[in-house]
Amino acid sequence: MLTNNRYQGSLISSLARSLCLGTLSLSVVGIDSVTANQSLNVPTQTTISQLNVDLKPYIETYSQIVYLNYSDSRAQADTMELAIADFLAQPNATTHNTAKEAWIKARQSYLQTEAFRFYEGPIDYIDSSTGEEGPEGRINAWPMNEAFIDYVRGKSNAGLINNPNFEISIAGILENDQVTDEADVTTGWHAIEFLLWGQDFNDQGPGQRSHTDFLPNQGNNNRRRQYLELVTAQLIEDLMFLESEWKPDANNYRAEFINSDPQETIGKIFTSLATLSAFEMSSERIAVALDSGNQEDEHSCFSDTTHQDFVFNAQGIYNVYFGDYKGYDGLGFDELIELLSPELNRQIIVALDQTKSSISNINQPFDQVLASPMGSPEREEAEFAITSLEDQAEIFQQVGTVLGVDVEILAE
């Protein structure tokens, strides 16, 4: 069990649904209102103090989406592990491609879970008394110094794999993870990505590592094979931990989350959405790479799937706001905001759709955008996506005004 000290850190349709669920009491406390940020053209709106709304069902929907999404991510990582095992059993171009395709597919679920970060939940908690941290850094750290793991162009003996004094074990791999340099990443999605694809030296396609790097009993191939197996298993272990902490009807983080102060909890949820939008996606993953023009600043540079990262991060935000995930249709925050400010809800939906559209228009692979000259259509499309994400985050902050909570844009 994870306890709190480890985590310090249309109106009519909506109304009818809430009444059917027994979650809304229309006890008007008083007619007070707030004027929203005029730059966003949000009109006078009802505050949460005017309605006795039971917020818990919205939080329960959110929690179930988190659980289902992490469950899918773990299941798809299991499928990837099987594909990698088949590849290592019979290393050839076909099994190699199948393993790479499984990695790409598995990423799609995980990327949506990034909408659950930035409030020190199971994914990124920090225990100040022990220094223990959530597994986010082990799972998805980037950018990475690939030479810390394996050979790179011009350095055939680089990395832990080619160091005869380093014993390939999960303990050793974890002990060396991001110790002296945050770029010295030894685990997670991008370590697996590098091992499967190798370095990417052109803007026409992904890395071209050969399957022959994994033929047994040749050079350091056995060490490379073992390393790939171990970091894949570690990824699944970390995903299983996240899945278990959000499992329903258990003595875990989810139980505490649902029973915490509901307004404060919703503030955390929208801080997560705003931060993913404006800081992580807009700034760290698009703007930084555009400014440098360096392929190494791509989020998924080895596989050339950075565009997929943007698409499924945006989908994760969509899932949370509308309370939908695949076949699960819960009570969405769109329904809550519709009760309080239909115009704000409309603006959020417009912003979400604009972000999805602008991201879909980014040229792919993304390294072609980075290689494009300043002022080119390719760069302008990416810059428009940045603006859309920033606008989206600012509108999310207006939810804080309606609910009387803090919605922040955090910078790690």
Task: Locate each region found by the language model.
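N-terminal secretory signal peptides that target proteins for export/translocation
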Residues: 1-13
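Mature extracytoplasmic or organellar-lumen-exposed domains after removal of signal/transit peptides
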Residues: 40-412
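Bacterial N-terminal signal peptides
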Residues: 16-29
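Domain-scale selection of a single, long terminal region
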Residues: 2-3, 31-32, 74, 82
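Signal peptide processing junction and immediate N-terminal pro/mature segment
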Residues: 29-43
